Amino acid sequence: MELKTKISAEDGKQDLVITREFEIPLELLFTAFIEPEIVEQWMGTKVLKLESARHGSYQFETTDPMGNKHRFNGTIHEYEPDHKITRTFEMENTSYPVQLEFLTFEQLTNNTSKLTMHIVYKSVNDRNNMLKLPFAQGINMAHNRLQEVINKIKK
């Protein structure tokens, strides 16, 4: 099965680019990243904090199948509604260093939009270690859920 979410990772570079086109109006796609109730539904995580503003911060908590809790946090550096979010992302209590994420939201038509995530890692090795995880499948599944959640909201 072809993944709708595309990941481009050039050899020898410490970044990657994730793109996905959605059958969602731009405003709803952006909302899916800033409204805690919607984020929880498509990310499958509990939102402990989400300050969707410049210099805001966020913290999410996920429980794995064995009951272990994992937390993720970051700071929002740029925030332009319906256009851009620049933020850090950190997996707490892991060996993975903080990464920098540039999220760009683009209107394609009145009912379709595109998300581009440019993620920069501390090193090429850090990026490659992330790609060894079931990263592509996981983000594709999350984006599929995002589409499903917004489809329910649109009705």
Which stretches of residues belong to each language-model region?
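Hydrophobic ligand-binding cavity/cleft-lining segments
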Residues: 1-46
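Intrinsic-disorder/low-complexity, polar/charged segments enriched in Ser/Thr/Lys/Arg/Asp/Glu/Gln
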Residues: 13-19, 57, 71, 84, ...
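Short beta-edge strand/loop motif at the mouth of beta-sheet-based domains
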Residues: 17-18, 36-71, 82
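Hydrophobic/aromatic beta-strand elements that line small-molecule binding cavities or substrate pockets
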Residues: 20, 48, 72-78, 89, ...
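A short, structured loop/turn motif at beta-sheet edges
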Residues: 26, 77-83, 104-114
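Hydrophobic pocket/interface hotspot
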Residues: 29-30, 39, 58-60, 76, ...
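Beta-strand/loop substructures that line and gate deep hydrophobic ligand-binding cavities in soluble
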Residues: 93-137
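Short, highly charged C-terminal tails/helix-capping segments
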Residues: 151-155
